[in-house]
Amino acid sequence: MPKTLHEIPRERPATPLLDRASSPAELRRLGEADLETLADELRQYLLYTVGQTGGHFGAGLGVVELTIALHYVFDTPDDRLVWDVGHQAYPHKILTERRELMGTLRQKNGLAAFPRRAESEYDTFGVGHSSTSISAALGMAIAARLQGKERKSVAVIGDGALTAGMAFEALNHASEVDADMLVILNDNDMSISHNVGGLSNYLAKILSSRTYSSMREGSKKVLSRLPGAWEIARRTEEYAKGMLVPGTLFEELGWNYIGPIDGHDLPTLVATLRNMRDMKGPQFLHVVTKKGKGFAPAELDPIGYHAITKLEAPGSAPKKTGGPKYSSVFGQWLCDMAAQDARLLGITPAMKEGSDLVAFSERYPERYFDVAIAEQHAVTLAAGMACEGMKPVVAIYSTFLQRAYDQLIHDVAVQHLDVLFAIDRAGLVGEDGPTHAGSFDISYLRCIPGMLVMTPSDEDELRKLLTTGYLFDGPAAVRYPRGSGPNHPIDPDLQPVEIGKGVVRRRGGRVALLVFGVQLAEAMKVAESLDATVVDMRFVKPLDEALVRELAGSHELLVTIEENAVMGGAGSAVGEFLASEGLEVPLLQLGLPDYYVEHAKPSEMLAECGLDAAGIEKAVRQRLDRQ
C-alpha cells in the first residue's frame, strides 16, 4: 500500500529508484518488485516539486500507480498515451525526461501546466479542456490502422470528464469502427461504483486474460455463422458480467468492459494492462483511485487540494493585498439578487467553487443547477428556463463558453431569450496558460445581434453591470477577470446603470484612452504624464457612439485598451464606428496580440502584451512621435 504523508517536504527527498527511471525506457528496465517503492518515491517528489512551484495537486497524487503501470506496460512514446484535461499529468512529466525541469513548472519559459505537444514527444496531444481524450486517441488509432502501424492508443479520462457529450460521441464512434484502442476510466470520485476489492480485481484479471479473450473470439467466429446464436451468447455474457461488474452501459456501447479495479494496486494494474494491451477492438478499463492519495490532508479535502500555491518560507507568507476576488463579488451579488427575485436560477458547468457559487448553492439549493462538464447543455437549459419566465444566470469561464457557441447563438440569441452570462476568467489567467485564457469572448460576443456585452473596470462596476444585465430584456454578458480587484468601495444596492453609456474618469488634452475593463487602473497611472482623457467605456455593445464621436472631435489620438484579442475586439468596434462616420482621427488599438500568450505570472503576461502602465505609455508615446 502507498505510504501516507502528512506534510509537504521542504527539502528534496532522496529518490534512488526514481533517479534510475528518468525515462519510460529506464522505467521498463526495473523489476516489478521495485515498482511500489518507485511509486512512494514519485509521490514524495511530486509533493516536493509542487510545493516549490504551486499547481494542480490532488489529481496527480491519485494516478501515481496508474502512470507507472502505463509507461511500464506500453511502449511509450511509440504507443500513444492521451491524458484528458491534464490536471493529473505531473507524474507523467516526471517519468518522461522532465524530472529536473519540474522546478520551472507554470513559470515563464518553463514547463506548461498541461501536456503539450511542443514540450515533449511523450505528450501526444495538447490538452487543458476536458473530454477530448477519447476522440483524439480514436483518431490516432484510426491513423495507425490506415498506416499499417502496430502502435497502441490509450486514453485516460476521469469520471467527471466522462459526463460530457463529446466523450460519449467518441465512445459510440469507436465501437462503430471497431477501433483497436484502450480507454481507462480514472474514477476518483466513486460516482460510478463502489464495487472495488478482491473480487473485482480477480474478475478483471480473468476477463482480461489471453485465455478468456481467445475463447471469446473463437466462440464469436463459430457462433457468428449461426443466425441469432452470437447475439444470444453476447447478451448472456453481458448479463453475467453485468451482475458482477457495473459495465453494462459501456458493453451496450460496444466496448469490452473490465473492472472496476483498485488503481493503487500496482501488481493488478500491471497484470490487467498487459492482458488488455493485445486485445483487439475497443477495450474499456475502469480504475478506481483516490484523489490526493498518499497525502493525508488532500485525501480529506480533495476539492481544497485540487491545486495549491507554492510553499512560503516560515514567517514570509505575503500579506493579502487588493480587494475581494471578482468571483466573490459575483457570488455575493447572486445571493443578493436571488433574495429579491425568486425567478433567479444559477447554473454552472462543474465550476461551483471556481465561480463562487457555494453560498448560493447552500442558500438556494432548489434554484442551483450544476450540470457537470456539459457547457452546451448548460446554455440550452438556461434557454428553456427563460422560455418559461425564469431568470437564469449562467456562471461560466470565458474559455469554456467557447464550447457552447452554437447554443449561445441558436438557442438563446436568435430567440432573444433573457439569459445572463457571468463570464469569469476573462482575459489572461496566468500560469494555466493559453488553454485557459479568456482571450476571445469580446470578439465572439459582439458580433451576435441583440447581445448586451459589458466590461466592468472594478468590483463596484461588476456589481452594477451584473444588475444591468440581469434587468435587461434579452441575452446579456458581463466579463470579468481572474483574481482580485483594486479594493474599490462597493455599493450594496442593486442599481443598474444606463445602457450604452460610458463614464469619463479624467479629462485631458491630446490623447483619449478608451478602456474596456480592468485596465482602467493601469490607464489612470499614466494619465497625468500623458495628459490623457480616460474613459471607462463599460459597454462594448451597444457602444457609446455619442461619446466616441465627441472624443474623436476633441483629441488627436484615440487609444482603445482591452484584455481581449485585438482582432475583432472592442477596439475594432470603435474603428468600425469611426469609419462608418467618416471620422479620420487616428486610432491605436491595444490588446492581446495575434499569438497565444504562454504561461507566466499575470503581471509578466500583461507586460509582454503592453497592457501594463509602462506598456500603455510606451505605445502611446511611440504613436504620437510618428504623427
Curated annotation (Swiss-Prot):
Pathway: Metabolic intermediate biosynthesis; 1-deoxy-D-xylulose 5-phosphate biosynthesis; 1-deoxy-D-xylulose 5-phosphate from D-glyceraldehyde 3-phosphate and pyruvate: step 1/1
InterPro entries named in the record: Dxylulose-5-P_synthase (IPR005477), THDP-binding (IPR029061), Transketo_C/PFOR_II (IPR009014), Transketolase-like_Pyr-bd (IPR005475), Transketolase_BS (IPR020826), Transketolase_C (IPR033248)
Enzyme class label: transferase
Catalytic activity, as annotated: D-glyceraldehyde 3-phosphate + pyruvate + H(+) = 1-deoxy-D-xylulose 5-phosphate + CO2
Gene coding for it: dxs
A Gene Ontology BP annotation from the UniProt entry: 1-deoxy-D-xylulose 5-phosphate biosynthetic process
GO molecular function terms noted in the UniProt entry: 1-deoxy-D-xylulose-5-phosphate synthase activity; magnesium ion binding; thiamine pyrophosphate binding
Gene Ontology cellular component terms for the protein in this record: cytosol
Residue numbers binding thiamine diphosphate: 87, 128-130, 160-161, 188, 295, 375
PROSITE patterns listed in its UniProt record: TRANSKETOLASE_2 (PS00802)
Protein name: 1-deoxy-D-xylulose-5-phosphate synthase
Disulfide bonds listed in the record: none
Source species taxonomy: Bacteria, Pseudomonadati, Pseudomonadota, Gammaproteobacteria, Pseudomonadales
Binding site for Mg(2+): 159, 188
Subunit note: Homodimer.
Family named by the database record: Belongs to the transketolase family. DXPS subfamily.
Note accompanying the cofactor annotation: Binds 1 Mg(2+) ion per subunit.
Main function: Catalyzes the acyloin condensation reaction between C atoms 2 and 3 of pyruvate and glyceraldehyde 3-phosphate to yield 1-deoxy-D-xylulose-5-phosphate (DXP).
SMART domains to which the protein is assigned, alphabetical: Transket_pyr (SM00861)
Cofactor: Mg(2+); thiamine diphosphate
Source organism (scientific name): Pseudomonas aeruginosa (strain LESB58)
EC number: 2.2.1.7
Keywords: Isoprene biosynthesis, Magnesium, Metal-binding, Thiamine biosynthesis, Thiamine pyrophosphate, Transferase
